[in-house]
Amino acid sequence: MSSTSKVESAKKLAAYKAVDENFPKDAKVIGIGSGSTVIYAAERIGQLDNKDSFICIPTGFQSKQLIIDNGLRLGTIEQYPDIDIAFDGADEVDPQLNLIKGGGACLFQEKLVAASAKKFVVVADYRKKSDKLGQSWRQGVPIEIVPNSYSKIIQELSKKLGAKNVDLRQGGKAKAGPIITDNNNFLLDADFGEIEIDNVGKLHEQIKLLVGVVETGLFTNMANKAYFGEEDGSVSVWSK
């Protein structure tokens, strides 16, 4: 099996097991996140016999399409602010279930859905496990900001909070200029190196206090469980 096939198999195993072990029989509202592993979670949820009995809330355009493609009922967070359970991926997870999210540029809506859920379950493959955030995810902490504040925030992240490097995320070949989020904001990626487990919450709060910051990609005290598909075909589970 190629390394790519092995990773995809790991993602599917983790997502299916997470849905099978956590999906409430009486669920009415489900959060569906974004990312490559959530594709399999949505697929598994779409196989449920009672899929017409609950509403699914997306975290962005991609997850909205996943909900539609799997024949699930689509709702909005405005209509259904109380969510029974949410499934989402992560860019990196530490042993305390702190997360870095936002590599796919949907972090505000992902955090809104996670914060609205009674239970939040993360699905990922073995590459996303780390002893500390920033250990394997080297792109930095994603930060969603109001567009005209980007110069000042970049300055303050570096001078006040000690970021080693801060980049305004660009659209690359697909788009000239910065990436625009689903909320019409910009994204920064701030490199703080490896973040000590005890400092994740403090760093999130410090960033949030900067004028113009909408949300950070640091998710702390939110996830209840994380499922990781392993290289050997097993699934490991971290829980709080």
UniProtKB/Swiss-Prot annotation:
PANTHER family membership: RIBOSE-5-PHOSPHATE ISOMERASE
InterPro entries, sorted: NagB/RpiA_transferase-like, Ribose5P_isomerase_type_A
UniProt record, GO biological process: D-ribose metabolic process; pentose-phosphate shunt, non-oxidative branch; pyridoxine biosynthetic process
EC number: 5.3.1.6
Localization in the cell: Cytoplasm
Site, Plays a direct or indirect catalytic role: residue positions: 88
Superkingdom assignment: Eukaryota
Pfam families: Rib_5-P_isom_A
Location of the active site: 110
Species of origin: Candida albicans (strain SC5314 / ATCC MYA-2876) (Yeast)
Oxidoreductase as UniProt keyword: no
GO terms of molecular function: ribose-5-phosphate isomerase activity
Main location: cytoplasm
Function recorded in the entry: Involved in the first step of the non-oxidative branch of the pentose phosphate pathway. It catalyzes the reversible conversion of ribose-5-phosphate to ribulose 5-phosphate.
Family: Belongs to the ribose 5-phosphate isomerase family.
SUPFAM superfamilies per record: D-ribose-5-phosphate isomerase (RpiA), lid domain (SSF75445), NagB/RpiA/CoA transferase-like (SSF100950)
Keywords: Cytoplasm, Isomerase
Gene encoding the protein: RKI1
UniProt-recorded name of the protein: Ribose-5-phosphate isomerase
A GO term from the CC aspect: cytoplasm
Keyword Isomerase: yes
Residues reported in the UniProt entry to bind substrate: 34-37, 88-91, 101-104, 128
Pathway named in the protein's UniProt entry: Carbohydrate degradation; pentose phosphate pathway; D-ribose 5-phosphate from D-ribulose 5-phosphate (non-oxidative stage): step 1/1
Catalytic activity: aldehydo-D-ribose 5-phosphate = D-ribulose 5-phosphate
